[in-house]
């Protein structure tokens, strides 16, 4: 009697084995946890986990082969982030289940401290940049996307939200204050936060010139617990200067009153690395899905979005996220 030899699916079994191998090391699991809502370069991860560059590179290679991490080039640097689980594909459900369990882990205190150090190093670079270029701020902005190029689209979206006459607004990183007059005309009270004294002085001068009596300027880190809350929180070309954009959205969410809105104007992902030196950008724009995912993780709901193409090749995304009246479950 002839017996049929079963045909093994080597490709599928290899893929499953690769995923199991990647999840079988404590350091790799902690790397996945650290990448939950952030992205880091190889040197940053080596610093965070106090290990050699070659060692962390090996672990990242194993994670990449298992499709647990993805890479994105930021100028001359390559940053790693978690890859999204595609549950409709083979191993996708196991991938998703692994990440769910990883998210229940708590990173060791020393790892969390080193992550904070990396974030502070990024923030210091951004702060130093704005201290140097305050006098040429507008010229620097115009290299990529000046306010007039997206003002009408942003105002159209803002006006469609029909805020009450008593509503309040908070602008994070107002720059030279170019958008403050528009907010002052639409809201009863406007607060503008900046951690750069030089930039806040430019905003103060504009407020004085235009007589914006209902605008309050504060020299304060927007992520500070003492920051004010408002019905509408606005970030115009600011998020790419934050050390940890996903964490920034999460920490800004409590600043939005229940039922209120977060308006983010940002660059779409690009590869113009000169923007780092010329404009102090820590991140070269963002993928649309990343902003939506970070907002959702913070408990915000996606609403209307507008996308603009510029002649210089850059694309702008104007995004609206709403904080629901009832709290959502936040991962």
Language model segments and positions:
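Class I SAM-dependent methyltransferase SAM/SAH-binding core
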Residues: 170, 175-224
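A short SAM/SAH-binding and catalytic strip from SAM-dependent methyltransferases
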Residues: 232-244
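C-terminal alpha-helical "lid/dimerization" subdomain adjacent to the S-adenosyl-L-methionine
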Residues: 261-320
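N-terminal helix-turn-helix DNA-binding core of bacterial DNA-binding proteins
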Residues: 14-55, 78-85
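A short glycine-rich, Lys/Arg-flanked "PGG" loop and its adjoining helix->strand segment in the class I
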Residues: 247-261
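Amphipathic alpha-helical dimerization/coiled-coil segments
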Residues: 2-5, 89-136
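A short acidic, Gly/Pro-enriched loop at the edge of an enzyme's catalytic core
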Residues: 223-233
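Conserved alpha-helix/loop element of class I SAM-dependent methyltransferases that forms part
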Residues: 145-166
